[in-house]
């Protein structure tokens, strides 16, 4: 069995994960010393799973009768040793259609380490194959939501590390079957509370089933109170009884933030998509939609792709860490994990230019030093994710002297954005149209159609899905869609090998970033450093003053790296930024409808009195990625892909709210301003 806690909604978020406290029996069975309970039956853990959870949720029959391309969602309270998941994987692979996907969600407050999982699985030869697959992708011990995929994405595992009631409200899925695991109600009363059953009801439908090892009266009464029909059955082994059943009601649940509710259902049968913009944001979402079976046309106003910040020789890939593990940290951790999931296969196949050579984040000020050290200790960053280096250790890793301490991220690195754009746009289902500046986006003038009409000076295009990824400089289009995008100029400096006293072994961030690498046969340069922030300057011309500033910042961090050079080279680009430094991602709301539904209403009503957000069908945006685009565009692509096809959410609800395209207008209204 496994543990999950149920704190109140308003309890302060404590990011540091608690470790599982385990004792091992002579037979190799793990026991929680905190709860004085075993993780699974000493008699036969796999037989226990099959009997309680698979049989009493009728999973063999349900998997076998699924239609092609189906989705099936299981939500489990308490991942524990993972035996429930592994046994379910075997059944799924045996019984389900080859193109169906299992989404297995599990919440765990005290996650086991990879080595502890391996030890727990060692006695079960039957699950060795899915165990190895899980251990290969098992996420880092960091709080919150983690997605991993097994068996060519036939199985998606979403792990929530932390309190159950911090996790369950973050989900907006339709659960087909519940695995109510967790240590016994007597020993873990915090989990078995009425709010657990309320959340179960919120995420269930009339076909949803549940099963649990316990038949405690409080559990049965709690489930029945929230609409579940409960039956008892003989328990497994020494347990006298268990219970199982189904959700017997269909009741509406009011949203706590109706203005941020996700667009539901997607397009009924999306076939064609138009993506406006061929930078990183546009190319990645085009690739995602093409991979989902859509025919995609990409419209680019320039003569070539990736002409703004996406055209830099190299960009750093690394997470953002903060001591309070705030929403930006959570978003960019999720984005970092997603970026690596996309990039690793391309690195391995040499399809893109870049290197996962680690990244040293140097603490250039006392404030930065304190922030990074607090993040390391308060969040409890695992060493496989990040570890602290003094100046000597940092110098050794970088390969150049530095006088600064820093935080090293071994999984981070750099990539050439243009190579990613080229790789994405090479998909056979994508057609690229250059020198096509979009002048208007309008619904097709046919009441029976939900298609969009896109006008350029040269052509008219039509599609059922449109994604606007135009970046910083298309002010008219951004204004038309109520996107508060502000362009911020940035200049990077390029250096040839003769301009350097030595190479950098890792990517380095300081007050800017510096990268050494092979940028491709067409590039004469060996290093890049930058980038300046020069708002509100919109001149595309390279500046000597900006080069001097880039050199100064690099030398401040790495005093012996750059040689004296008067050969100034580089690139100017414009970052699309937002007021809160998070991107704008998702379905574009119907702002005219919002005026009546929200802005002309008092902001003080109870939330249930407001209608759920209404969107412009088939219209999406991925913009405002700023200086951290390499950690957000891939996640944005997956978010939009899931919205278009009606697939499950790809990150917590709170993060959807944080990047919602209408968030600034909503915040203004909710503040009482007019």
UniProtKB/Swiss-Prot annotation:
Which co-factors does it depend on? FAD
Tell me where in or outside the cell this protein is found: Cytoplasm
> What highest taxon heads this organism's lineage?
Bacteria
Q: List the keywords (alphabetical).
A: Cytoplasm, FAD, Flavoprotein, Methyltransferase, Multifunctional enzyme, Oxidoreductase, S-adenosyl-L-methionine, Transferase, tRNA processing
Q: Protein transport among the record's keywords?
A: no
Which positions are tagged coiled coil?
Answer: none
GO MF term list: flavin adenine dinucleotide binding; oxidoreductase activity, acting on the CH-NH group of donors; tRNA (5-methylaminomethyl-2-thiouridylate)(34)-methyltransferase activity
Q: For this protein, what reaction is catalysed?
A: 5-aminomethyl-2-thiouridine(34) in tRNA + S-adenosyl-L-methionine = 5-methylaminomethyl-2-thiouridine(34) in tRNA + S-adenosyl-L-homocysteine + H(+)
Belongs to which family? Answer: In the N-terminal section; belongs to the methyltransferase superfamily. tRNA (mnm(5)s(2)U34)-methyltransferase family.
Provide the function of this protein.
Catalyzes the last two steps in the biosynthesis of 5-methylaminomethyl-2-thiouridine (mnm(5)s(2)U) at the wobble position (U34) in tRNA. Catalyzes the FAD-dependent demodification of cmnm(5)s(2)U34 to nm(5)s(2)U34, followed by the transfer of a methyl group from S-adenosyl-L-methionine to nm(5)s(2)U34, to form mnm(5)s(2)U34.
Q: Which NCBIfam families match?
A: MnmC_Cterm, PRK01747.1-2, tRNA_MNMC2
Q: What is this protein called?
A: tRNA 5-methylaminomethyl-2-thiouridine biosynthesis bifunctional protein MnmC
Please state the gene responsible for encoding this protein: mnmC
